[in-house]
From Swiss-Prot:
Membrane topology: Peripheral membrane protein
Location in or out of the cell: Mitochondrion inner membrane
Enzymatic reactions: 2 reduced [adrenodoxin] + NADP(+) + H(+) = 2 oxidized [adrenodoxin] + NADPH
Functional note: Adrenodoxin reductase transfers electrons from NADPH to adrenodoxin, which is involved in heme A biosynthesis and in iron-sulfur cluster assembly. Involved in the electron transfer to heme A synthase etp1(cd), a heme protein that catalyzes the conversion of heme O to heme A. Required for the de novo synthesis of Fe-S clusters on iron sulfur cluster assembly protein isu1. Involved in electron delivery for Fe-S cluster synthesis. Essential for coenzyme Q biosynthesis. May be involved in the electron transfer required for the hydroxylation reaction performed by coq6.
UniProt protein name: Probable NADPH:adrenodoxin oxidoreductase, mitochondrial
Enzyme Commission number(s) from the entry: 1.18.1.6
Any single Gene Ontology cellular-component annotation: mitochondrial inner membrane
Chain residues that bind NADP(+): H164, G165, N166, V167, R208, R209, E220, G382
Cited InterPro entries: FAD/NAD-bd_sf, FAD/NAD-binding_dom, Ferredox_Rdtase, Ferredox_Rdtase_adrenod
Annotated binding of FAD, by residue: A27, E48, L56, V92, W375, G382, V383, I384
Transit peptide: 1-38
Amino acid sequence: MLSRFIKRTYSTQTSSPVVGIIGSGPAAFYTAHRLLRNDPNVKIDMFESRPVPFGLVRYGVAPDHPEVKHVEHKFSEIAESTQFRFLGNVNVGTDVSLRDLTKNYDCLVLAYGAAGDKRLGIPGEDLSGVYSAREVVGWYNSDPRNQNLELDLSQVEDAVVIGHGNVSLDVARILLSNPAQLSPTDINPLFLKSLERSNLKRLHIVGRRNIFSVSFTIKELRELFALSSAVFFAPSFNYSTKWMNETDASGLDRPRKRLLKLLVSEIQKAVSEKRVAPYSKDKKCWNLEFGLTPVEILGHKGNVENVRFQITDSIRTDAESKFTTIPAQLFIRSIGYKSMPLPGMKDVGVPFDDAKGIVKNVNGFVRPGIYTSGWVKHGPIGVIATTMMDAFATADTITKDWKSKKEFLKNSKLGWDGLKKNIKTPVIHWKDWKVIRNAEIERGLRHESLSEKFRSNEDMIKLIYPGKK
């Protein structure tokens, strides 16, 4: 049955392909860019479940990193192509089925990213005051999906962030920043008000493994050390001598050695100045912990109060204790995002690996006529530059397969024109997105900020469709 479904004739392959891309983040746009560069006559329809484009560039990049968002200008150039169509506020799997897409496109590219979270799976993870980094990032970036967080920073003196990646450092930096320095950015003004009331005194960025396993980069680490509103304090024990052992560092690459040198230098400086845990002064304080695995989040009256850790790094001078506890009224896990399957994938022969959180593929190829790109292809790793190269590779595979007359989807080649009559949701086109964006810039001018994003999908849709309910 499945073989009959995916079989196609090659009679329509004399022309350029009609491609449907699901998602509108970096992987999606870079795939579109490369496809258009390989063949200027390719037609691309890009489906996005939100009313607005750009995915994690819009809702994941820290507001104090506006230079990273400059890539939006490149994506906008792509979207202005006459061969390109943006279809926002269209949920693939609910508003339109994957099966219907296969009937109208030569090729589909799954590039919808990772909207789920990995969990620790420990007792207390559902207590009030426990959040994923994605939720907190979404809150301060005005993501409509994360505007109901009941997080009152005025009630927080101690915070724990689990994870040693760049997202962890981003979250920590924002929580430790001076609100006045963030106000000119496009940060959520409601978050900013909460930050102004913050009573945060100590923030611990905790890693389950040792220093050699950190995923963050030296740029993000330097930004934390450079904060004028916060001061770094060392743990009550000193790793430094062991960390500087040439035997331990001999297998590290140059960037990791530079990072290690910076970190050890700052720890030694903190120790010499007697800035050791539980250090406290007028400024907010933060530190990095290694070799601590959370085993239980302890609460009081439904709220997080302490976090119990197992000590797993023998380098620690307190390793004989086996366990340690850190106070926390805020616990943020930053251990990775996770892609989720789209409804109807099995119906069209798309295999999804639930354990890995990816679409099963071979170098982006899923099955004839269906490909994948970005985090849903290989997992939530890499920066925008690596996503670009990965997306280019998928696009090149599609172009090569098309020119080689390999199997693609048997379809009408109508694309969106074959689907739109059955779509009930109000669709946001590229011209509509520009109206939304201009309105956000105007909103920002009132607060002397870069822009003020809409915090609800409904408000964006009402702006374009005033009469819609």
